Amino acid sequence: MKKLTLAIVAVLSCVFFVSRCALAQEWAKQRLEQSPRHHEWVDIKYGDRTVHAFIAYPEVKSKAPAVLVIHEIFGLTDWARELTDEVAAAGYVAIAPDLLSGFGPKGGGTSDYAGTDDAMKAVSGLNPDTVTADLNATADYVKKLPAVNGKLAVTGFCWGGGQSFRLATNRHDLSAAFVFYGTAPKDVSAITAPVYGFYGGNDARVDATIPDTVDAMKKAGKKYEPVTYEGAGHGFMRAGEDPTQANNEGNVKAREEAWARWKSLLKGL
């Protein structure tokens, strides 16, 4: 009986854990559902590819710049979409492509994957050239929208931070690139847009690359302004607004400061 009781407890614990994982971003989904802004899904087609993308529109009178949002290594999650809505709330047409489009187990995207581990493996295995092509197609699409004034910026987080830096080497119509805790490409010579970096002080893996990036950008004559937020870890923009996180003061503070800086920089587009 004791063994049976322990087994039942173990099963219930697993069910609880899985449920917690599945609902890990329920708070982001709820905020998204409560947003007063217009959202829509679009399919962007080029060649033999179809990229599923989420768009959030600002409530403004005139045309606005567009911001291309590149998701974390977890794929286009509820938080990634909620962040996209926050960018729209600041006054910009924000678009976030699901870069797992067509690669899911059922031919879909991020939502096809059973969990974050599977999505992470899939994102990690994406062909860099395909990613860049998907981002270029998305950028071309959003720039043509009637609500956009022709200006374009890119931002990315974690894995997406590195991709935003990389896109700046491939696309020369960017007004700015905002890199959140992402690493730089090896060759930065083709970059034409200013690059603004946002890093957590407790993120040694990424932070160790900053000095070399500063040197490379300086030698290439490019504008690069990194800021490190002490007490914050990797992924602080998500963790800093997650109400389920404990002992989260460093991430909360970093997110507030980074978001204030980001909005100020966006106004300069």
Q: Which residues does each predicted region cover?
A:
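Serine-hydrolase catalytic machinery in alpha/beta-hydrolase-like enzymes
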Residues: 28, 32-35, 41-144, 238-244
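Primarily recognizes the serine-hydrolase "nucleophile elbow" in alpha/beta-hydrolase
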Residues: 135-192
